[in-house]
């Protein structure tokens, strides 16, 4: 594993430990060059309450690796989380910089009604 990936994983581990202390559900984001994924994980950390990604049927048709796709995933995860009864989450960016696609997803989720 290269140093860049190791430091990202280390940052993510520290952030997740802090979120566990808070005891709230977390919106976990993962990105690859081609897709972006989002999951709302329960406060206990044992189950996924809601999930959305660019692999979903309605989002798969267009371009999946850009900011527009990330904001579509953000809107979708906000809808699904609210339908599951979750309105407040901690944003887990998985060690990725809060920039570009990760920021677009977070902004769209906030507009969709999730509180961070």
UniProtKB/Swiss-Prot annotation:
It holds the Pfam family Ribosomal_L18p. Coiled coil: none annotated. InterPro entries: Ribosomal_uL18_bac-type, Ribosomal_uL18_bac/euk. It comes from the Bacteria. This is Large ribosomal subunit protein uL18. GO terms for cellular component: cytosolic large ribosomal subunit. One of its GO terms (molecular function) is structural constituent of ribosome. Keywords: Ribonucleoprotein, Ribosomal protein, RNA-binding, rRNA-binding. Belongs to the universal ribosomal protein uL18 family. GO terms for biological process: translation. Gene3D superfamilies: 3.30.420.100. Part of the 50S ribosomal subunit; part of the 5S rRNA/L5/L18/L25 subcomplex. Contacts the 5S and 23S rRNAs. This is one of the proteins that bind and probably mediate the attachment of the 5S RNA into the large ribosomal subunit, where it forms part of the central protuberance. SUPFAM superfamilies: Translational machinery components. The keyword Cytoplasm does not apply. The gene is rplR. Signal peptide: none annotated. The keyword Ribonucleoprotein applies.
């Amino acid at each position: 594993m290269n140093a860049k990936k190791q430091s990202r994983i280390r940052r993510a581990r520290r952030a997740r430990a802090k979120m566990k202390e808070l005891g709230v559900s977390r919106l976990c984001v993962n990105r690859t060059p081609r897709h972006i994924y989002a999951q709302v994980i329960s406060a206990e950390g044992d189950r996924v309450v809601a999930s959305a990604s660019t692999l979903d049927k309605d989002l798969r048709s267009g371009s999946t690796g850009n900011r527009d796709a990330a904001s579509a995933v953000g809107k979708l995860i906000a809808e699904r989380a609210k339908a599951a009864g979750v309105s407040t989450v901690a944003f887990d960016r998985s060690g990725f910089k809060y920039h570009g696609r990760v920021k677009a997803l977070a902004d769209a989720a906030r507009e969709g009604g999730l509180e961070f």
